[in-house]
Amino acid sequence: MDLAKFLCWIVLLLGISLVESRYMVYNTSHTIVPGKLNVHVVPHSHDDVGWLKTVDQYYVGSNNSIQVACVQNVLDSIVPALLADKNRKFIYVEQAFFQRWWNEQSEEIKRIVKELIHSGQLELINGGMCMHDEAAPHYIDMIDQTTLGHRFIIREFNVTPRIGWQIDPFGHSAVQAYLLGAEVGFDSVFFGRIDYQDREKRYKEKTLEVIWRGSKSLGSSSQIFAGAFPTNYEPPPGGFYYEITDDSPVVQDDPDLFDYNVQERVNAFVAAALDQANITRINHIMFTMGTDFRYQYAHTWYRQMDKLIHYVNLDGRVNAFYSTPSIYTDAKHAANEAWPLKTEDYFPYADRINAYWTGYFTSRPALKRYVRVMSAYYLAARQLEFFKGRSQKGPNTDSLADALAIAQHHDAVSGTSKQHVANDYAKRLAIGYVEAESVVATSLAHLTKVDPTLNPTFQQCLLLNISYCPSSEVNLSDGKSLIVLAYNPLGWKRVDIVRLPVVGGDVSVHDSEGHEVESQLVPFTDEYVALRKYHVEAYLGQSPTQVPKYWLVFSVTVPPLGFTTYTISTAKKTDGYSSKSYVSNILKGEQSIINIGHGHLKLSFSTDQGTAINYVNGRTSMTEPVKQTFSYYSAYNGSNDKEPLIPQNSGAYVFRPNGTFPINPEGQVPLTVIHGPLVDEVHQQINPWISQITRVYKGKEHVEVEFIVGNIPIDDGIGKEVVTQISSSLKSNKTFYTDSSGRDYIKRIRDYRSDWKLDVNQPIAGNYYPINHGIYLQDSKKEFSVMVDRAFGGSSIVDGQVELMLHRRLLLDDSRGVAENLNETVCVQDKCTGLTIQGKYYYRIDPYGEGAKWRRTFGQEIYSPLLLAFAQQDDGKPMSFGAASFSGIDPSYSLPDNVALLTLQELDDGNVLLRLAHLYEVEEDKELSGVASVELKKLFPGKKIGKLTEMSLSANQERSTMEKKRLVWKVEGEGSYGEEKKAKRGREIDPRKLEMELYPMEIRTVLIHLELPSSHSRINRFDA
């Protein structure tokens, strides 16, 4: 070969080599390297289950004029991206989306996805239907929505989620740490939002990662490793966003092209890693590579991350690799480090000065109430579905379960979505209710054993909150009777009051044995008539055909997990009529003091002040001056703010008051006082848009306050946040107690945080906390407790005083993404007015140390009200009940006073899911904080418990298996296994004795297989 040909050949080879060099095989196979800084690259997408768009719009990618987001694309594109490189990983959270997608896939895709999950490339973490909020949901709802997701995952993939991933909720509940963390089998929980002052201190002390011990009762037995991200849940600083619409610099590694920047991007990555390492213990850090609705075209992300991992590892200063939070947690655990201890919770949350996210504790109070009502209904409906037997083809409670699960999302019940999305959440609940209502009606017909030829139909009244109940508003003058069935979902016998609108006054009430029951007629007032008419037209599109004259009030006694029936009919001459109430309108100066109350409790009102002034309980010798008032905070307009650059308004998330304005009665408004044998009431019209009724019931030792707030006026261009204050003389010393998601109570001190020295810049908003269950004050002699009917925000801004925020109507957005002011309206045809809220709270004063029993017991009654159903009975055609009363448990038995039934549910496979909860904390009550014992046999009378398996809280694995897998963490200042004195837990259930022990704050979950007599079909579970 001559020289010329040889040189040509060499040039050709070099040319081929140069062309081929443009195809790179990136090395993504690195794993943990001891001694180096290990950067765990965690690809994820945060997919809100509704926020700016509805859940379905987000899934299919519609309504993109609001936000370009399509979760279907995310999941579609992740699968081939993972298949392209076995080292790539991805985590997914929201089961509401994943299950929609899964149900649409072919068997081949399902097989591939299962392989990806089992290989660890795709990890399902958190595992609930949504990433639930932690301020507004009740703990039972949090458990239910998590269970729904976890049981799907174990059924389809035979895996159990290990990691909590609460990266976006706006503050974090202690219940999340121990109940929805450790008790569901999680080894760690990660989140993005903690107070900016707290975060700054944790930067300096390297305490972003802690051992979180959320329950003082369960202690180290339910602690969890918890990590707060350095900033949020997004990629690290330096420009690492790779959605096709993002503008971060890509890794341009082709030297033949302009803008080659490999070293520049490596340097940015390493700099971000070293910065994060400086605030993190142990040589492992996590980069959260993703944010809201990312990976819609997954290859754009993985192409860049492949390059980064490849070139960063060639650089050698740090070690980068694809990872998951599970791998990260195991690495932290393997270091055998002792970690700082965190107790209590992460409320309230502020992301900067003057920006406390405490407004959403109250935002959309009607939706919050609707969620709570549906939660209680679902609990009762599942019980009745079990008693009858779950239908395999007909209506069931699944639709309501799904709707409730989605409603727990941190932009749903929180009240922080756009209005059309809030409407969608409510619509889903309404659809779920209709199907569950059918389940309840057929179950009750089955259990009452009414002659089916009579075509028995039990109606229900969902709109009693607006005083509308067609079933009770029937004309009984023609000889008809109304059957009222009251079902008690609690595990105790219950004596309660029923209030129903009726059209006539000559009625009497009889129990199932024909004995007359004492009753009272309370006149229907103007505020009820107006509220009823407007909202019936708004919701049903038609006006009520008649106006009730009275509320019929009577007392019912109902067995545990059972019902009793009552008959309302036209009073016969031999009957005693329902007692009409004595009504008086008292003007200022006519009578200085008015007293109401039956039995031990007396409440005094001042006509001069127009408010309650004195509370007296003769049984406990408690006498206390009280005063209840209304105020509003004008919403701050941040347009004049100089710092920060973005003005801070009060909005759906943020509460920023700009002055407090008392709301006083306009002119001389009379107190309308109603006296009767069962209840005394004081009606007050505070102003044209606020009214309230204060009630004291016979035999009860608490005060009930029903309020109506709205239409809040905004003609002055100022948003308003309406609060009520209940004042006492208690010397509470800046201290008060609020519940954690309806479970434990946490001590709060005004203007103080236990974890850092608080810089007080918002003395009102910065002292607000979420209230799901109640709030109380105490001094050395007394306890003052207030219980609520939904999630509210509240505080004790002044010693001796409880403050609740009841309603918000705002005209500005707070710049947190929703881009819509919180101005809810209700429309009749083309006329819209501000939303009116009706609700209740309750208060009571007890000797010091004795208030817990009322809070815990009555709290259960508030959460689980009686379920009422109605049937008409024609004269001459009596409805013959085979069972006019019923109890689903042994008639001689009830649950202990300190135990609540959380779940009684028949599952698809015929097994029964049972959850029981100890209601008290350690040392909360002298007697009821002790160990409780439940005889499980007596919960299933006449049935044999064939097999019983104790499960994790979310019922996706045996508890014994979960405990064996649990990681044990060291805590600074403690021994290797935490506290020397561990919290007590109930003993293993003996399969012969079948007794369950529960210690304070313990919840135990069991799966039960019932062996039914062969002569009984599955759906005739409670035939006589």
UniProtKB/Swiss-Prot annotation:
Signal as UniProt keyword: yes
Its EC number(s): 3.2.1.24
Its required cofactor(s), as named, are:
Zn(2+)
Query: What are the alphabetically sorted keywords of the record?
Result: Disulfide bond, Glycoprotein, Glycosidase, Hydrolase, Metal-binding, Signal, Zinc
Q: How does it assemble?
A: Homodimer.
Q: What does this protein do?
A: Liberates mannose from p-nitrophenyl-alpha-D-mannoside in vitro.
- Please report the name of this protein according to its UniProt entry: Probable alpha-mannosidase At5g13980
| Native source organism of the sequence | Arabidopsis thaliana
